[in-house]
């Protein structure tokens, strides 16, 4: 299988892990993984060399160089690695497909641009391809995003490019059925579809980095959120902080700290600013920049508890839920009650500190619910004893088995 993905360890982007987890497991099912990626010297994001330890030696990694970032009159035109590396990836893919025998080509998005080479490669070399959705390519803009701006341009471009990328795809996969339902309704495609969660490899979450110390204040109980902060999640973050403010007024909790890692988003009011506005700055520490994946795992292991705050949307798929269940002493969660993540919590009897979000619940009641759950969550005597056996069906090997069966069915049906 030829996997074309511009990010690969030591790149520290979120998208690395789904592709890595699948590639690592393919050999168990009789497949050889070749990953075609961009040389890390051309990656703008921070690098995490430790991540290379998590790549199976069975995975062949082929790297190409991307073109430099484009500027005009001192202004940055584009720097997206999927664009800068597109030609080099396509040319090397074409060469590999001519010289070797591959049975399938796989793209995982984002990056949004690499699947655009799928129709060309498939037609030219006769190899079927699939597109995997970790995030929706086309999505509904929030009221704050609407207007003549970059977000609207991005969505307009997505509406134009998505049909081109998937029109000849033999397989669509995704972390959520909701994502694929949207693709199908927009494009009226009849190709095979399969869903499987982000998944996890338990061993990833046990790696110790000896020279890293979590950013915890001495003498305080530390609770950690590590992940993104986006438009569809912003209302829930504010509600969480409002619930925390209410708790602080009734039951001072200055011996606690709530640390938010990787939540920088220039389009949104910062969590630091919201905490200041609510008068709870002493409780909230925001580290806007993402930190290396293995450092995050160490923070989660050593914290008094982990926090998962998600989207208002029902198709929300909490990839970070797995790492928190595997590593944390206890878990507070707040996201849509109809999401698959909620069902996973219930399966694992891990929902003691879960607050369900539903648009029918009033803001006042949500804040009260958060206050009550957080008060329970921070209680050292509160027992949280999840049953993790149900997670087995979501681990990386189980996911890869589901994926491989779908790929092999596609190949069989194509004859």
Task: Locate each region found by the language model.
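Conserved donor-binding/catalytic core segment of Leloir-type glycosyltransferases
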Residues: 2, 215-235, 241, 399
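A charged, aromatic-enriched C-terminal amphipathic alpha-helix characteristic of glycosyltransferases
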Residues: 357-368, 372-409
């Amino acid at each position: 299988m030829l996997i074309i993905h511009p990010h690969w360890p030591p790149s520290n982007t979120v998208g690395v892990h789904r592709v890595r987890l699948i590639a690592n497991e393919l050999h168990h099912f009789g497949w050889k993984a070749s990953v075609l990626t961009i040389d890390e010297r051309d990656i703008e994001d921070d690098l995490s060399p430790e991540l290379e330890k998590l790549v199976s030696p069975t995975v062949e990694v082929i790297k190409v160089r991307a073109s430099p970032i484009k500027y005009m009159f001192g202004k940055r035109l584009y720097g997206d690695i999927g664009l800068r590396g597109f030609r080099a990836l396509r040319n090397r893919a074409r060469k590999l497909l001519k010289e070797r025998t591959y049975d399938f080509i796989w793209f995982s998005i984002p990056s949004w641009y690499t699947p655009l080479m799928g129709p060309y490669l498939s037609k030219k070399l006769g190899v079927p391809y699939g597109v995997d959705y970790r995030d929706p390519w086309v999505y509904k803009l929030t009221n704050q995003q609407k207007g003549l701006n970059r977000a609207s341009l991005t969505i307009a471009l997505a509406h134009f490019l998505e049909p081109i990328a998937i029109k000849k795809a033999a397989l669509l996969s995704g972390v959520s059925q909701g994502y694929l339902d949207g693709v199908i309704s927009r494009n009226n495609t009849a190709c095979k579809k399969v869903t499987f969660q982000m998944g996890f490899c338990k061993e990833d979450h046990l790696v110790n980095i000896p020279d890293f110390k979590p950013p915890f204040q001495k003498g305080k109980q530390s609770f950690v959120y590590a992940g993104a902060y986006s438009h569809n999640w912003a209302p829930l973050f504010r509600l969480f902080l409002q619930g925390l403010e209410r708790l602080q007024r009734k039951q001072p909790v200055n011996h606690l700290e709530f640390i938010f890692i990787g939540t920088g988003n220039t389009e949104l009011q910062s969590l630091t600013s919201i905490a200041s506005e609510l008068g709870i700055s002493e409780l909230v520490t925001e580290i806007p920049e993402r930190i290396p994946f293995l450092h995050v795992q160490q923070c989660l292991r050593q914290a008094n508890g982990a926090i998962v705050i998600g989207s208002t949307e029902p198709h929300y798929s909490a990839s970070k839920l797995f790492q928190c269940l595997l590593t944390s002493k206890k878990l507070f969660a707040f996201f849509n009650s109809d999401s698959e993540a909620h069902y996973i919590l219930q399966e694992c009897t891990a929902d003691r500190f879960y607050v369900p979000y539903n648009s029918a619940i009033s803001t006042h009641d949500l804040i009260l619910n958060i206050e009550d759950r957080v008060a329970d969550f921070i209680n050292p005597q509160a027992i949280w004893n999840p049953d993790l056996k149900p997670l087995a069906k979501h681990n990386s090997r189980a996911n890869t088995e589901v994926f491989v069966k779908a790929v092999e069915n596609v190949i069989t049906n194509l004859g």
